[in-house]
Every structure is written in C-alpha cells, then in structure tokens.
Amino acid sequence: MLQQRTIKTLTRAVGVGLHSGQRVELTLRPAQPDTGIVFRRVDLPEPVDIPITATAVVDTRMASTIGAGGAKVHTVEHLMSACAGLGLDNLYIDITAEEVPILDGSSASFVFLLQSAGVELQNAPKRFIRVKRPVEVREGTGQQLKWARLEPYHGFKLRFDIDFAHPAVDSTGQSAEFDLGEGNYARDIARARTFGFTKDVEMLRSSGLALGGGLDNAIVMDDYKVLNADGLRYDAEFARHKILDAMGDLYLVGKPLLAAYSAFRSGHAMNNLLLRELLAHEDAWEIVTFENERQAPAGFTQPVRAW
C-alpha cells in the first residue's frame, strides 16, 4: 500500500513576512492520518484552524492567501510547495502572525526543516486526485493571453513558460519543466527564489506590500541586470520559481494531483481558478489509492532525497 506521510517530530522556524514585514514564528507538527494540512493561527485570542482546500483560498494578489473563521494566512505557496515536493499529506502548521515567513525566498529552508524533522509513513492509504480529462482556463488575447491546463498523466509533471522582456530573463531561459518521477524536487526546484524589479518596489510598498523583501530573500533586477551579488542559483531560475509556486498553489487542492500541468504566464489567481474549474466537473477527476506500490506513479513511492 502506498501510505500517507507526516513528519516524525515538530520543528520550528522564525522569520519575517515578505509583504507584511512582521516577525513570525512557525511550528510544524505531526498530524494523524487523514488530517490533511492545517494552518493554525495561534496568535489570536481563540486559535483558528484553516484546513487547506481550493475553496479556502480567499486572495491571490501577489501571493496565495487562505482563510477561515475570519482569520487569514498569507503567502502559503512556498511552504505548500515544499510539502508537495516531499509528499507530505498530514501536518499542523502553527503560526503567530498572518503571513508565512519568506526565509530566503525559495522553499529550500522549508525542505530542510521538514527533512530534518524526518518523514514518517502512516498506516493509511495515500489518496490522489487523478485528472481524467483535460481542463483549461484562459484569460486575455494576443499579448495579454495567459492560460493554465491540467491533462491526464500517470504521475505529476509541470511545464511553465514565462514572458518577461528583460535581458536577465532572456539570457537564462523563459521556460522550465519538472517531472516528480524523474527529477529531484530538493535539488531541481526548491532553491529557486521569488523575483521582482526595483521599479515595482516603491509601488508595492506604498500599497503595504513587499515590506519584508530584499536582496537576501529575492532575486532583484533593475532594467538591465540581476542586482544580487551571488547571481542566480539555476539556469532559468525565474521559470523554475514559477514551477515552485505552481506546485504550492496546486497542492492547496488538499491532495496530490496525478496530472500534467502546463501554463503560460499563469499566476496564483489562475492556478486557483484552474483547481476550481477541475473540481466543478466531477467527470474530470477521481480519487484513487494504490494498494500495490509497483502500480503507483514514479516520484511518490520513495521519500525525496536531500540535495
């Protein structure tokens, strides 16, 4: 039987929110089978649980925000991406503020925390959402066109194409692909950082966003080049970060997907719209388990190796 996974022991991190700039403490705790991933706002007078679901997403401006019972947690996508990459099904995430810490702008620190806590197999079948037919969402036309698509696939793979007219992006590639069954999430995707442009920072900060952003937790570019002294971590790091984000956004459906995802200029809003479009058509998906691990898709049977 392909089993569900949680972590063996609790682990903690402290950082600041990318947009809020607030100090935040994060505690990741093991959870029982079939719990799912649950964020808990422990800073409120009465703690509020926010289980992840596609419909728990309440805002997608600049990040994915989930909410329940009047409480919200912003910028969940990097931590959720790490959970997806490591195949974790059940986890409690206690948080002392309204935004997940940005740490280094990638999911690498979350991967390190979770792997350090250890991955524990649980006596319950791992449940997948298997996509049975193509589902697509589109927006705009011509140069404004953007789209995202899910198609049937015995595994989980992603392709993302971006379109930034910038020398640094052009020189490293505008597309990236990742197959969970062939690649290694920790090595190939997790270290890709969020990115932004200096010309946008003042506008964002005047709107109360990017207050915790800087060269230590993002790739920052002027009109011509990357400003970070250490340069880029990957070829096509920009497109790889979009894959990192998409993995986190898609994992908000609450179960791992068996599908091929492809997208052009998509973002948090379109990724969530794609999930809602999928769930709205019951003929497009089904819940499956694998009693025989040999029949399970590659990439889900063994814990992800470290770097």
Swiss-Prot record:
Pathway per the UniProt entry: Glycolipid biosynthesis; lipid IV(A) biosynthesis; lipid IV(A) from (3R)-3-hydroxytetradecanoyl-[acyl-carrier-protein] and UDP-N-acetyl-alpha-D-glucosamine: step 2/6
Active site: 268
Enzyme Commission number(s): 3.5.1.108
Pfam families reported in the protein's UniProt record: LpxC
Gene3D superfamilies: lpxc deacetylase, domain 1, lpxc deacetylase, domain 2
GO molecular function: metal ion binding; UDP-3-O-acyl-N-acetylglucosamine deacetylase activity
Primary enzyme class: hydrolase
Listed InterPro entries: Ribosomal_Su5_D2-typ_SF, UDP-acyl_GlcNac_deAcase, UDP-acyl_GlcNac_deAcase_C, UDP-acyl_N-AcGlcN_deAcase_N
Catalytic reactions on record: a UDP-3-O-[(3R)-3-hydroxyacyl]-N-acetyl-alpha-D-glucosamine + H2O = a UDP-3-O-[(3R)-3-hydroxyacyl]-alpha-D-glucosamine + acetate
Domain of life where this protein originates: Bacteria
Single GO BP term: lipid A biosynthetic process
Any GO CC annotation of this UniProt entry: membrane
Keywords of the record: Hydrolase, Lipid A biosynthesis, Lipid biosynthesis, Lipid metabolism, Metal-binding, Zinc
Binding site for Zn(2+): 78, 241, 245
UniProt cofactor(s): Zn(2+)
Function: Catalyzes the hydrolysis of UDP-3-O-myristoyl-N-acetylglucosamine to form UDP-3-O-myristoylglucosamine and acetate, the committed step in lipid A biosynthesis.
NCBIfam families recorded: lpxC
Family: Belongs to the LpxC family.
UniProt cross-references to PANTHER family, sorted A to Z: UDP-3-O-ACYL-N-ACETYLGLUCOSAMINE DEACETYLASE 1, MITOCHONDRIAL-RELATED (PTHR33694:SF1)
Name of this chain's protein: UDP-3-O-acyl-N-acetylglucosamine deacetylase
Organism of this sequence: Acidovorax ebreus (strain TPSY)
